[in-house]
């Protein structure tokens, strides 16, 4: 029960999001501030079709809609943190606060674009929440660790390599 009086933090990814593609408002009614949605671009478009349309539209009148704008609008509508996955992962809370975690330039990790890596990210977010971080902070920490593990492993990465590399990342941080 997502809306229970003392509902725990809940991370929704993949099929948990796709299950509501025909009725996203039903999902939004059940969410609370302790929830996190972790869609990739396709899942985002199914949950927030109007926002995705604006995001993908050319800027013919006025300024373009950025991934930051779109993620903020989605978080406000859903009433919870939204982590929009991509090479520039955007994390937004319903209050409008936002962070971006890039996996390009000096933190390039293009090999993260592999099947299952988003599932690992959702697991990392869940683990961070279990350790007591709030939803936005858990999403931010998990996104950073996700990229660091991928960078440490390097090319040829498959999703299963990410959790196996995490102890090295944490040791390097002194954790």
Placement of each model-derived feature along the sequence:
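Glycine-rich phosphate/dinucleotide-binding loop and adjoining beta-alpha-beta core of small-molecule
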Residues: 1-104
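Feature representing long, continuous alpha-helical segments
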Residues: 69, 122-123, 136, 164
């Amino acid at each position: 029960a997502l809306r229970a009086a003392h509902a725990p933090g809940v991370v929704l990814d993949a099929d948990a999001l796709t299950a509501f593609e025909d009725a996203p408002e039903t999902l939004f009614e059940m969410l609370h501030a302790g929830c996190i949605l972790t869609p990739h671009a396709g899942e985002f478009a199914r949950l927030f079709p109007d926002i995705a349309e604006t995001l993908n539209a050319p800027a013919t009148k006025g300024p373009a809609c950025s991934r930051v704008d779109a993620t903020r609008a989605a978080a406000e509508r859903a009433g919870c943190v939204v982590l929009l996955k991509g090479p520039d992962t955007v994390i937004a809370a319903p209050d409008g606060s936002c962070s971006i975690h890039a996996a390009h330039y000096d933190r390039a990790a293009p090999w993260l674009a592999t099947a299952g890596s988003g599932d690992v990210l959702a697991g990392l977010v869940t683990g961070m929440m279990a350790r007591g971080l709030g939803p936005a902070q858990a999403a931010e920490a998990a996104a950073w660790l996700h990229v660091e593990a991928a960078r440490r492993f390097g090319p040829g990465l498959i999703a299963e390599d990410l959790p196996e590399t995490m102890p090295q990342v944490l040791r390097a941080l002194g954790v």
